[in-house]
């Protein structure tokens, strides 16, 4: 057995790596599909379901505070809301930009967000259907992007961060709000989470690999209903 195994390996040293790679990619595709199906079915009740489980989104003021602070010395013409969902954050983003683009992979979510924007009389919002792994944006189209409680829903966060880097103008602002690492398994079933939050050091490493430098960050302690949250503001490194 050993000689034949060694001969086989030396004859094609990449075959096992290729097989592993195919398995990983297949797993990621399944995860993406699961997330898409989940959000397509919960669009109309997503906000109420989240509020029931976690309480109000009390980190939103912190997101707005950092966005305003980081935009003092830069002009934000176009701000993109990644995984915009039902559009709860869009009014806040609209106060800091001339145009807001909401992107989501679930058409049903965009329908809810569009209806709410029309009811609020928001004319500066545009909606685009597309995945976060392949953003419907031109290279450098956005001055800022906001990923609010989005990254824990994607199968491959680093892939998404690299795509964010592509869509941002050099020096553009990236604002990321997400859970700190936690052990609340119920989030997988009830909220469609693929990741139970993130380790701070691991996330910093991904941001650096994707081409970002962290400008500032804040934390919001967890409570009985909701895990801890961190909000990170980073810049797309100048090339």
Please report, for each region that a protein language model flagged, where it lies by residue.
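N-terminal auxiliary segments of SAM/dcSAM-dependent transferases
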Residues: 1-37
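Class I SAM-dependent methyltransferase SAM/SAH-binding core
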Residues: 78-81, 85-134
């Amino acid at each position: 057995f050993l000689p034949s195994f060694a001969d086989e390996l030396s004859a094609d040293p990449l075959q096992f790596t290729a097989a592993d790679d195919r398995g990983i990619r297949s797993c990621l595709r399944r995860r993406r599909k699961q997330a898409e199906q989940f959000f397509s079915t919960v669009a109309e009740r997503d906000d109420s379901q989240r509020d029931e489980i976690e309480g109000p989104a009390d980190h939103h003021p912190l997101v707005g505070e950092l966005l305003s602070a980081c935009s003092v010395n830069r002009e934000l013409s176009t701000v993109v809301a990644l995984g915009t969902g039902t559009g709860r954050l869009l009014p806040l983003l609209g106060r800091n930009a001339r145009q807001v683009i909401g992107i989501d992979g679930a058409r049903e979510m965009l329908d809810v967000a569009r209806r709410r924007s029309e009811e609020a009389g928001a004319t500066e919002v545009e909606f685009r259907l597309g995945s976060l792994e392949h953003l419907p944006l031109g290279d450098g189209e956005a001055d800022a992007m906001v990923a609010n409680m989005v990254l824990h829903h994607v199968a491959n966060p680093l892939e998404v961060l690299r795509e964010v880097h592509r869509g941002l103008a050099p020096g553009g602002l990236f604002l990321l709000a997400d859970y700190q690492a936690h052990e609340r398994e119920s989030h997988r079933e009830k909220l469609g989470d693929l990741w139970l939050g993130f380790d701070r050091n691991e996330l910093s490493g991904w941001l650096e690999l994707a081409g970002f430098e962290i400008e500032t960050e804040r934390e919001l302690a967890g409570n009985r209903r909701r895990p801890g949250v961190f909000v990170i503001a980073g810049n797309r490194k100048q090339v």
